[in-house]
Amino acid sequence: MKTCLVVDDSRVIRKVACRIFSDLSYQTVEAENGAEALVACRRQMPDVILLDGHMPQMSGIDFLRSLRSETKGNHPIVLYCTTENDVAHIGEAMAAGADEYILKPYDKVLIEAKLAEVGLVQAR
């Protein structure tokens, strides 16, 4: 079974995202911030990470930079999520290593489409 690490400082948002991924037959792991997410990745690298951009302790972009430097090219797919629809912010996230960019609130159909694009779920 594929795994998804859901990283968001909002417990409610993590639960919604976990439900979406569970419905897509993913096992889910949760982290409240980037620092917790790095620990989770060191323990077991997930297949995909759903990453909030704005969190305390370590932002999503800082997490991406740390993850990419630690994994040296052998890294999971990262879906970067935020409420910002700002081209500069999107560019910074992509440059830091995000594979896809999704605006909140989460949408199951969009997440499934993004996963299908990268071969992590069967397209319907």
Language-model-detected regions and their locations in the chain:
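Charged docking surfaces used in two-component/phosphorelay signaling
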Residues: K15-D23
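Receiver (REC) domain active-site loop signature in two-component systems and cognate sites
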Residues: M55
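Active-site beta3 strand of CheY-like receiver
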Residues: Q44-L50
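Acidic catalytic/metal-coordinating carboxylates
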Residues: E32-E36, S59-R65
